Amino acid sequence: MKKMKVNVIMPMLGGGTRMRGIQPTCKPLMKLPDGNLFFLKALKSLKNYNVQTLILVVLKDYFKDFNDVLSEAGRVSGANSVHLIPHEPTSSPVETLRIGFNRLLTSYDVNLPTFVLDCDVYGVIPVFEPMDFEAGRVFYFEDKNPNKSYIRTKGVNDDVVAEIVEKRVISDKAVMGAYLFEDIHLLRKLLEYTSYPFGYISGLIQYAIESENATIGASPAANVTNFGTIEELEQYGK
């Protein structure tokens, strides 16, 4: 199957308070035991995709550090163009996504499907055949950790998201932290709202399902490894 062309936005303006003091840098630039930087390891999840534009929304105080590894981000992702956006911390991942998406609007390939990718998880994101009228897709792995987001699925093939919730176990399908918006017009419409009753990407997707009647697919990712908490980092590679 031919690789799908995609754009990628990595929102990285969180404070990373759970990891503070482990290493003298921000969370995305921390090193894993194998030497990979967090966000570079996460980008390796996209090896089955043809990345066109990569947008990294980063903390202003660490702009120089990110700039020093910008070429590596391009090499790892295979992106045709990489854009670094320094910014002050925001109140939520959705606000950070909006900053990245506004930059994407200046790109010639803005209408391509767009991944929103967390910086603290790795997994092999599979290729898939989109369903009719599919607006997006969520990738998941088997887990029961209450600190994750979870989906409940439906459909003949159990591959349609019926519900997505944050930090509440409603199934054994934990969200990997990779969200694909295939309908860019829908994403733009969602981000044009000025306020939300939620701040997580999962809430944005649930809103799309409930209010826009959007069809969101679900696919299992392989070899998922999380490293966003101290406990997960200690278990990395074991």
Listing of model-derived features with the role each one plays in the protein:
Residues 14, 120, 229:
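Active-site glycine-centered loops adjacent to acidic/histidine catalytic or metal-binding residues
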Residues 8-14, 29-32:
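A conserved hydrophobic helix/loop-capping motif in glycosyltransferases and polysaccharide synthases
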Residues 122-198:
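Conserved core of the sugar-phosphate nucleotidyltransferase
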Residues 1-10, 18, 36-114:
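Conserved N-terminal catalytic core of the sugar/cofactor nucleotidyltransferase
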Residues 24-42:
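Short catalytic helix/loop segments, enriched in acidic residues and glycine
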Residues 116-118:
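Active-site acidic Asp-centered loop
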Residues 4-6, 172-238:
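Conserved alpha/beta core of the MobA/IspD/sugar-nucleotide pyrophosphorylase nucleotidyltransferase superfamily
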